[in-house]
Amino acid sequence: MTNIHPTAIVEDGARIGNNVTIEPYAIVKKSVTLCDDVVVKSYAYIDGFTTIGRGTTVWPSAMIGNKPQDLKFKGEKTFVEIGEHCEIREFAMITSSTFEGTTVSIGNNCLIMPWAHIAHNCSVGNNVVFSTHVQLAGHVQVGDCVTIGSMVGVHQFVRIGSYSMVGAMSGIRRDIPPFTIGTGNPYALGGINKVGLQRRQVSFETRLALIKTFKRVFRSDESFQASLESVLEDFGEVPEVRHFVEFCRQPSKRGIERGVDCEASLEEPIDKKEGAFVES
């Protein structure tokens, strides 16, 4: 049964699903769609042509679908789409998009922690975690299963590849290749996100191929393009390696981050139980 508190403001025209809870003093504007089992906590504000997927919770004082912070916006009809079973925590802000018909999208099973900001025209994949105060500028693309630490700033038009992990307080100015881990301002790649991939049950053989790919691309004397070609020749049967190469070859407004933390070790075992080491 849907439960809307008497002090909540739900405008005529808002589409409310089954078993939705809207707590005291929350505001839901007329063009919003709340799917089944959504919870809108006290003082949350949801505006614009916003759709919130099943089972998602919007926590107190979060703001979703408000006017983009972009001087180019002239009142066009734009959208926000949030997937299923997400947690949009306190004071997070997800603005609407800029340019007619465009969408800010967030996938399923995402955790957006307090004070995070997702700007106009951003795209966020599934199973993503943004820690507190993560700040995405406009047009940023974030892949699936990405974790971004607290107080990270991301430049507009940057792409962050799937299964990557960005350390806290980093400044991201260029595209982050998938499956990598890094930190710093300026940002430096530290290697492959070995622990994260293991937790996602990526196979030992795939992790080993990705570590060798990273070393070939970022720590060899080959040119960037030549190293991408050579890893395809050696490890092209691994889908994750192909995805890594395709990401690096895609057109980019910011370019691929190539700064590497030379002190980061790539010689540790990627699975202690299996006892495998990677040659230095």
Curated annotation (Swiss-Prot):
InterPro entries: Acetyltransf_C (IPR029098), Acetyltransf_C_sf (IPR037157), Hexapep (IPR001451), Hexapep_transf_CS (IPR018357), Lipid_A_LpxA (IPR010137), Trimer_LpxA-like_sf (IPR011004). Pathway: Glycolipid biosynthesis; lipid IV(A) biosynthesis; lipid IV(A) from (3R)-3-hydroxytetradecanoyl-[acyl-carrier-protein] and UDP-N-acetyl-alpha-D-glucosamine: step 1/6. The lineage of its organism: Bacteria, Pseudomonadati, Chlamydiota, Chlamydiia, Chlamydiales. GO terms for biological process: lipid A biosynthetic process. It is found in: Cytoplasm. Pfam families: Acetyltransf_11, Hexapep. Involved in the biosynthesis of lipid A, a phosphorylated glycolipid that anchors the lipopolysaccharide to the outer membrane of the cell. Its EC number is 2.3.1.129. Belongs to the transferase hexapeptide repeat family. LpxA subfamily. The gene is lpxA. The keyword Cytoplasm applies. This is Acyl-[acyl-carrier-protein]--UDP-N-acetylglucosamine O-acyltransferase. It comes from Chlamydia trachomatis serovar L2 (strain ATCC VR-902B / DSM 19102 / 434/Bu). It is an enzyme of class 2 (transferase). Signal peptide: none annotated. GO terms for cellular component: cytoplasm; membrane.
